[in-house]
Amino acid sequence: MSVWISLIGIGEEGLDGLAPALKTLIDDADVLVGGERHLAKVPGGDAERLGYDNGFGAGLDEIESRRDRKVVVLASGDPMNYGIGAMLSRRFGIDDMEIHPAPGAFSLAAARMGWSLPDCETLTVHGRPADVLNLHMSPGTRLLVLCRDGDSPAEAAALLSERGYGDSQVTVLEHLGGDNENRF
């Protein structure tokens, strides 16, 4: 089987951050799959649109039913790092797809903090309970935590305090790589 799924990582800058060849893949797609915020970054076009804001697993059958078409799946940043890339490759096989990652949240956050990624613990509480952080808290550890919403940083800070790390510096970064990038 030839490649029929193109998995494209996009950043906050949307289409402006993509190489021309990736924009062409999106323009030529028969089916465009993504979360609401991903699809909103691609205005217009004639492609059928499939959203997956309520969980991606159920969308796999929808994608499978379009095997005879050019399918582009949009994801945040690097879809192979806590993203949907592994789920897609397990289901469809790497021979059916091509993966085009963009800089992910961890790379961008490490760059903003001036930290080397190998010197950090990278974790996500997106779709996971915040107490997963407990396994990684130790003196001097640098944690880069991908959060699910605006409440997650406060939950992480509360866990730090409960574990005796109340003096830790917590930096919140949002909309990395976009016009609304912010640091708190």
Where does each model-flagged region fall?
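Flexible, glycine/proline-enriched loop segments at strand-loop-helix junctions
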Residues: 96, 119-124, 140-148
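Short, well-ordered alpha-helices that flank and scaffold nucleotide-derived cofactor binding pockets
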Residues: 86, 90, 111, 158, ...
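A short alpha->loop->secondary-structure connector
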Residues: 92-97, 115-119, 163-168
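Generic detector of solvent-exposed, compositionally biased contiguous segments
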Residues: 110-128
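Class I S-adenosyl-L-methionine
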Residues: 1-108, 126-137
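A contiguous loop/helix-start segment that scaffolds small-molecule binding in enzyme catalytic cores
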Residues: 2-7, 20-23, 69-71, 138-184
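Acidic/polar active-site rim loop that often engages polyanionic ligands
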Residues: 90, 115-118, 136-142
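Glycine-rich, charge-decorated loop segments at or immediately adjacent to ligand/cofactor-binding or catalytic sites
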Residues: 107-115, 180-184
